[in-house]
């Protein structure tokens, strides 16, 4: 094995995590050498693909699980503030990439879209109203609106109100400054930008199989070229595992203490696509509901 294969950083997976981290390294440490390995034949095919996630610009504008009701009935907004700040930083980073001409055509991956929280029943309506009152004074949630009026709700979200019982107890809050994000397109743009970096190489159809830690602290990574069936060994100072569902098994192969006592569980979901323009035109919002009591947050209808 030759030391000529030695690189500073190896990124595993070509989804939004690895391409984002690689892009950050390109900006902050342009002299570092980067190798990205992806098992499939192009970036953003699995979890980052636009058909495999909700495409929400997560800023805690409509996601109710970030504002938790306390035992005394108050609403804790600290997590919502944290999430909102993090998403603002993401938008600033993407803006920098556009302004520096590293990625083009931003409207292909992000666009403005009102975010709505919608609830049903007296208990949930009471919660949403208190959430609205807790968020309203905060500048990051400026412009949030609240209503229980069916006629106003028909203006906000006509498709969701169509055929609904006019006596049903419902409520919604709305913020117009929400966003819809095509994480698949964003990932593809960052992968292309990274591939044009002098010190970066992207390898598709390459499967990372194992790791071993050398005495000098570096990592030896066993990688199989799925096209040629050849097994390669690469030496690197740092590893970044952004491999979606394969991340935990790969992390466990490193043997590091942080890999212990971790687990995952499968989540199944279904995204329905409407190709009827007349129906689509009635729903120009991102709407999130509230999960049924006693169920995990990923059961939120949206």
Feature annotation, model-predicted:
Residues 7-35:
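N-terminal Rossmann-like FAD-binding beta1-loop-alpha1 element of flavoenzymes
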Residues 55-155:
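Dinucleotide-binding Rossmann-like beta1-alpha1 core, especially the glycine-rich loop
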């Amino acid at each position: 094995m030759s030391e000529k294969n030695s690189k500073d950083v190896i990124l595993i997976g070509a989804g939004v995590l690895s391409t984002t981290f690689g892009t950050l390294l390109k900006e902050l440490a342009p002299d570092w050498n980067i190798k990205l390995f992806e098992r499939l034949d192009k970036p953003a095919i699995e979890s980052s693909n636009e058909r495999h996630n909700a495409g929400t610009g997560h800023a805690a504008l409509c996601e109710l699980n970030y504002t938790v009701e306390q035992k005394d009935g108050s609403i804790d907004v600290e997590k919502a503030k944290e999430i909102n700040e993090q998403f603002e930083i993401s938008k600033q980073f993407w803006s920098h990439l556009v302004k520096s001409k590293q990625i083009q055509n931003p409207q292909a991956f992000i666009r403005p879209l009102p975010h709505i929280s919608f609830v049903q029943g007296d208990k949930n309506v009471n919660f949403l109203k208190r959430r609205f009152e807790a968020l309203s004074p905060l500048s990051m949630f400026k412009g949030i609106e609240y209503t229980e009026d069916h006629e106003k709700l028909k203006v906000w979200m006509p498709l969701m109100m169509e055929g609904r019982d006019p006596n049903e107890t419902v409520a919604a809050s709305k913020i117009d400054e929400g966003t819809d994000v095509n994480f698949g397109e964003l990932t593809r743009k960052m992968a292309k930008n990274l591939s044009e970096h002098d010190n970066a190489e992207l390898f598709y159809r390459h499967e990372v199989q194992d790791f071993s830690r050398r005495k000098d602290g570096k990592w030896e990574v066993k990688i199989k070229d799925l096209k040629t069936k050849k097994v390669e060994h690469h030496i690197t100072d740092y590893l970044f595992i952004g491999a979606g569902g394969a991340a935990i098994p790969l992390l466990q192969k490193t043997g590091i203490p942080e890999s212990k006592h971790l687990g995952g569980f499968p989540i199944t979901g279904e995204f329905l696509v409407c190709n009827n323009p007349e129906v689509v035109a009635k729903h120009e919002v991102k709407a999130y509901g509230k999960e049924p009591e006693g169920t995990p947050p990923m059961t939120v209808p949206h």
